[in-house]
A protein has these predicted regions:
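Basic, amphipathic "hinge/linker" alpha-helix immediately C-terminal to the N-terminal HTH DNA-binding motif
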Residues: 53-77
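HhH-family (HhH-GPD) DNA N-glycosylase catalytic core used in base-excision repair
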Residues: 85-91
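N-terminal helix-turn-helix DNA-binding core of bacterial DNA-binding proteins
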Residues: 2-33, 54-60
Length: 91
């Protein structure tokens, strides 16, 4: 499930997401794998899980302070990937 964590982080950089929004945005991820990734990332302190007292229940996942501190690293990785993709497309 680790290959999904970077994609989850990429989404959470933009805004908080609900579980089904994340699942639909990550083509090919199973519900179990997404659940496991989110739990692991929450346990590691990278994301937060907020449950709202609403009917139906609403749960949102967002970057924690630790997760936010990873923003420059993730952005650098994204830039590298885009540059690499561009260079390999030219060859």
């Amino acid at each position: 499930g680790n290959k999904w964590k970077l994609l989850i982080l990429r989404n959470l950089l933009a805004r908080p997401w609900r579980f089904n929004e994340l699942r639909k945005s990550l083509d090919g991820i199973s519900q179990k794998v997404l659940t496991d990734c989110l739990r692991s990332m929450e346990e590691d302190g990278i994301i937060t899980r907020t449950v709202y007292a609403e009917v139906p229940p609403r749960v949102e996942y967002a970057l924690s302070e630790l997760g936010e501190s990873m923003r420059p690293i993730i952005k650098s990785m994204e830039e590298f990937g885009l540059n690499y993709k561009s260079e390999t497309a030219d060859n």
